[in-house]
Amino acid sequence: MLVLSRKEGDQILIGDDIIIKVISIEKDCVKLGIDAPKNIKVLRYELLQEVKNENVEALQGKERLIRIKDLKGLFKDG
């Protein structure tokens, strides 16, 4: 991992066409501007993780529902 120190207004170039600019630095918050081509996804990592976790929870809920229906069928037959 490359670690850089940047001041407000400084920019970083990634590849030939992605620019990261330090917009402002406040107490515990750094605001970044990202200029990238439209075909490049730019996502906040924590939001991506949250969506993944919600998808896992939804899948587990569906699996539980299927097991409950299977159990219900066992009692119905017996």
From Swiss-Prot:
InterPro entries: CsrA, CsrA_sf. The keyword Ion transport does not apply. It is found in: Cytoplasm. Keywords: Bacterial flagellum biogenesis, Cytoplasm, Repressor, RNA-binding, Translation regulation. Pfam families: CsrA. GO terms for cellular component: cytosol. It comes from the Bacteria. One of its GO terms (molecular function) is mRNA 5'-UTR binding. Gene3D superfamilies: Translational regulator CsrA. NCBIfam families: csrA (TIGR00202). A translational regulator that binds mRNA to regulate translation initiation and/or mRNA stability. Usually binds in the 5'-UTR at or near the Shine-Dalgarno sequence preventing ribosome-binding, thus repressing translation. Its main target seems to be the major flagellin gene, while its function is anatagonized by FliW. Belongs to the CsrA/RsmA family. Homodimer; the beta-strands of each monomer intercalate to form a hydrophobic core, while the alpha-helices form wings that extend away from the core. PANTHER family: CARBON STORAGE REGULATOR. This is Translational regulator CsrA. It comes from Caldicellulosiruptor bescii (strain ATCC BAA-1888 / DSM 6725 / KCTC 15123 / Z-1320) (Anaerocellum thermophilum). The lineage of its organism: Bacteria, Bacillati, Bacillota, Bacillota incertae sedis, Caldicellulosiruptorales.
